[in-house]
Amino acid sequence: MINLREITKTNLISIIDLDVNENQRDQVAPNAVSIAQGHYSNSAWFKGIFNNNLAVGFVMLDLIIKKNKCFLWRFMIDKKYQGKGYGKIALTQVIDYVKSFKVFTEIKTSYVPTDNSAEGFYKNFGFIKSKKVIKEFDLEDSGEIEMKYLLK
């Protein structure tokens, strides 16, 4: 059973050890970096993705409730567990969590446009591609393309 859990000192290493395929490494930061960034952000919400007691992925949102902004900052499933439907189940749980706030109208995310990008996954899930190119820290063009999921 797929579930989202707090990252604790007990499961931290199992989350840090998760990895994507080599040709996907330019798509998402290592989980150790994401966890560190999450700890230093006032608006980050992050969880481990587990199949029963086995760590299979990681998710992090940037939730700015006062501005009604939600960004799917990081989402990864370990290379050994991709293609099993875990990502779809976990993302459904994340969306249900975001909906529970009753203030957000959409969830935005982004992807690096390469042959092995997450665009297809997000598109199949119902995300809509926008024409906006993401600027990392509002300083430079990161080349990432924005997508959004409209909450109903």
Task: For the regions a language model picked out, list residue spans one by one.
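Acetyl-CoA-dependent GNAT
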Residues: 2-73, 78-80, 91, 97, ...
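Conserved GNAT acetyl-CoA-binding A-motif
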Residues: 98-110
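Conserved active-site alpha-helix within GNAT-family acetyltransferase domains
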Residues: 88, 114-131
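Conserved beta-strand segments that form the floor/walls of ligand-binding pockets within enzyme
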Residues: 71, 76, 108-110, 146
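Short glycine-rich hinge loops at helix-strand junctions in the catalytic core
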Residues: 85, 102-103, 126
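Active-site acidic-Proline motif in GNAT/NAT acetyltransferases
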Residues: 78-80, 84, 113-114
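Terminal substrate-recognition subdomain of acyl/acetyltransferases
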Residues: 141-152
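Conserved beta-strand-loop-alpha-helix junction that forms the acyl-donor binding cleft
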Residues: 108-119, 136-141
